[in-house]
């Protein structure tokens, strides 16, 4: 789920959900690294690359994390020091976050139910929404979601890897 390879996916979702993604994106190479399993494998030459996508909507949006009660940017560059460099996207796995886009021309809201694979795709959808609530039901019971989300007229997107769906108990 490399972000720079997800433009077609993001555009397909945008088309189905009736909004457009402009093409004013800039691809930034953030880091080169060996993946988290590199130390356990005999592979020594393969370098992975993390790239982020910038545009005015992404750059001006903020992420509120209900667990930490803190705001961050879409890309958390401090996570590049962690074991899982892919946590740069939306600060990694969290039960519930809100993404607020102050530059949106729309009042639309989106609720995304996702696993960690959605972290790199969700930022590409920011342009179409004023607010995106991202829920990872691996970390929060669906029974208490109405304590955090007022379900009314939002678009909803379910985005899970097949492993998460096949092994889910929630």
What spans do the regions from the language model cover?
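Extracellular glycan-modifying ectodomains
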Residues: 1-170
């Amino acid at each position: 789920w490399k972000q720079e390879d997800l433009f077609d996916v993001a555009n397909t979702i945008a088309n189905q959900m009736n909004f457009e993604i402009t093409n004013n994106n800039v691809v930034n190479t953030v880091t080169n690294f060996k993946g988290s399993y590199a130390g356990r494998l005999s592979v020594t030459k393969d370098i992975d690359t993390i790239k982020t996508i910038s545009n005015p909507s992404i750059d001006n949006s903020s992420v509120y994390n209900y667990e930490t009660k803190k705001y961050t940017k879409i890309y958390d560059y401090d996570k590049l020091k962690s074991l899982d460099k892919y946590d740069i996207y939306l600060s990694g796995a969290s039960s519930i976050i809100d993404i607020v886009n102050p530059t949106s021309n729309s009042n639309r809201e989106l609720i995304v139910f996702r696993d960690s694979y959605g972290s790199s795709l969700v930022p590409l959808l920011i342009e179409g929404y004023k607010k995106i609530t991202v829920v990872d039901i691996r970390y929060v019971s669906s029974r208490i979601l109405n304590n955090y989300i007022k379900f009314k007229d939002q678009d909803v997107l379910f985005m899970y890897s097949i492993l998460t769906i096949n092994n889910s108990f929630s």
